């Protein structure tokens, strides 16, 4: 059957041409590769819609979490205070990172089900004048919530604070440009909605923030200002770059443009979600979130209440049929996740539903209805 589809929020299934782009070796100091780095920076700024030239793009080696930590350590002063908006594992990771960095922080924790709202952010900022920055995850993939960044941003800037955004699993498919909502910096990575492969992340930040970040970072290798200054001076990365990943990313950017950019990519993902969710609901599965909060990136489903259902068995049966799904990350009830992103269309999602039906039959699970407790908990927290 060939390699399986990765129904995950990245790494994800990539196009053959993206894989093929990695078959050549590149010298990291060579002028051709320096040109490739410059091109990817320009292309990402174009996706961000920076027409005024107030922002710049700084690629950083490593996973997306490396770039999140780099952003936090570079742009939050050591005497600053952060409000972290949490509704899942990745918001919690931001708070954990700030603890390692020794940055004062407080949080609004909405649990697994609900997004932080602008009014809540406004109230928290009014109550604590010491807060200098707000940090939020754009798409919280532990649940699939797409957080309301526009109203959050308006609340932050109307009170004279600054916003930093982890758009790891949204940038490239969900509007996140400098004209969509205001922010000082936003981060994402190569292996998410642009559909490249893992190896680097990138920080898009105001040049004024980049300049102010000099000598602020806790880390040599995660210093965004130092990386930015060195790239602008030499065209090179400070340390060994993931050359093959950069080559693959440029091909992924070409395919992104060909599909219609953010709007085109987002439309395909949304259609993937709609087809898959409709089919899974016909089997009896229930989504964690109401339709108004379902992102086009990944969807969380409650595990069935049937005594024969075991996620590990379901996972292996789905894998045998060519689909890698994702375990849940909820704290209250059992769940699993199915991603909508990567080189897939609605026909693939129909096959996903068929594979789920076959897997349930193999397990002798005649209905995927979740436990009453899960539905009651969802209703209670969403009230």
Swiss-Prot record:
<keyword id="KW-0670">Pyruvate</keyword>
<feature type="modified residue" description="N6-(pyridoxal phosphate)lysine">
    <location>
        <position position="192"/>
    </location>
</feature>
<dbReference type="GO" id="GO:0047304">
    <property type="term" value="F:2-aminoethylphosphonate-pyruvate transaminase activity"/>
</dbReference>
<dbReference type="Pfam" id="PF00266">
    <property type="entry name" value="Aminotran_5"/>
</dbReference>
<comment type="similarity">
    <text>Belongs to the class-V pyridoxal-phosphate-dependent aminotransferase family. PhnW subfamily.</text>
</comment>
<keyword id="KW-0663">Pyridoxal phosphate</keyword>
<keyword id="KW-0808">Transferase</keyword>
<dbReference type="InterPro" id="IPR015422">
    <property type="entry name" value="PyrdxlP-dep_Trfase_small"/>
</dbReference>
<dbReference type="InterPro" id="IPR000192">
    <property type="entry name" value="Aminotrans_V_dom"/>
</dbReference>
<dbReference type="GO" id="GO:0019700">
    <property type="term" value="P:organic phosphonate catabolic process"/>
</dbReference>
<dbReference type="InterPro" id="IPR012703">
    <property type="entry name" value="NH2EtPonate_pyrv_transaminase"/>
</dbReference>
<dbReference type="InterPro" id="IPR024169">
    <property type="entry name" value="SP_NH2Trfase/AEP_transaminase"/>
</dbReference>
<dbReference type="InterPro" id="IPR015421">
    <property type="entry name" value="PyrdxlP-dep_Trfase_major"/>
</dbReference>
<keyword id="KW-0032">Aminotransferase</keyword>
<comment type="subunit">
    <text>Homodimer.</text>
</comment>
<keyword id="KW-0614">Plasmid</keyword>
<comment type="function">
    <text>Involved in phosphonate degradation.</text>
</comment>
<protein>
    <recommendedName>
        <fullName>2-aminoethylphosphonate--pyruvate transaminase</fullName>
        <ecNumber>2.6.1.37</ecNumber>
    </recommendedName>
</protein>
<dbReference type="InterPro" id="IPR015424">
    <property type="entry name" value="PyrdxlP-dep_Trfase"/>
</dbReference>
């Amino acid at each position: 059957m060939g390699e399986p589809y990765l129904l995950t929020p990245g790494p994800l299934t990539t196009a053959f041409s993206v894989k093929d782009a990695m078959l050549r070796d590149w010298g990291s100091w060579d002028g051709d590769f320096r040109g490739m780095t410059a091109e990817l920076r320009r292309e990402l700024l174009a996706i961000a819609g920076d027409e005024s030239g107030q922002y710049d793009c700084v690629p950083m080696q490593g996973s997306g979490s490396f770039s999140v930590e780099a952003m936090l350590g570079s742009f939050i002063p050591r005497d600053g205070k952060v409000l972290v908006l949490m509704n899942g594992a990745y918001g919690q990771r931001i708070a954990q990172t700030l603890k390692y960095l020794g940055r004062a922080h407080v949080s609004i924790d909405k649990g697994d089900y609900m997004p932080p709202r602008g009014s809540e952010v406004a109230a928290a900022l009014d109550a604590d004048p010491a807060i200098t920055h707000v940090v939020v995850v754009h798409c919280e993939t532990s649940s699939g919530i797409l957080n309301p960044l526009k109203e959050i941003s308006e609340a932050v800037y109307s009170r004279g604070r600054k916003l930093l955004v982890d758009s790891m699993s949204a940038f490239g498919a969900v509007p996140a440009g400098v004209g969509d909502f205001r922010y000082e910096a936003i981060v994402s990575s190569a292996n998410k909605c642009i559909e490249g492969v893992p190896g680097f992340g990138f920080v898009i930040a105001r040049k004024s923030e980049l300049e102010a970040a000099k000598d602020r970072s806790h880390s040599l290798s995660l210093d965004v200002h130092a990386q930015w200054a060195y790239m602008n001076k030499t065209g090179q990365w400070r340390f060994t770059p993931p050359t093959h990943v950069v080559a693959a990313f440029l091909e992924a950017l070409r395919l992104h443009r060909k599909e219609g950019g953010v709007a085109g990519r987002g439309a395909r993902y949304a259609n993937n979600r709609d087809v898959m969710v409709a089919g899974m609901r016909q089997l009896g599965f229930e989504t964690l979130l109401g339709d108004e909060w379902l992102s086009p990136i990944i969807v969380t489903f409650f595990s069935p209440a049937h005594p024969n259902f075991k996620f590990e068995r379901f996972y292996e049966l789905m894998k045998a049929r060519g689909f890698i799904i994702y375990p849940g990350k909820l704290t209250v009830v059992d769940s699993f996740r199915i991603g909508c992103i990567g080189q897939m269309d609605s026909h693939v999602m129909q096959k996903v539903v068929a594979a789920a039906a076959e897997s349930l039959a193999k397990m002798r699970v005649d209905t995927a209805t979740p436990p009453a407790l899960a539905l009651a908990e969802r209703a209670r927290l969403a009230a």
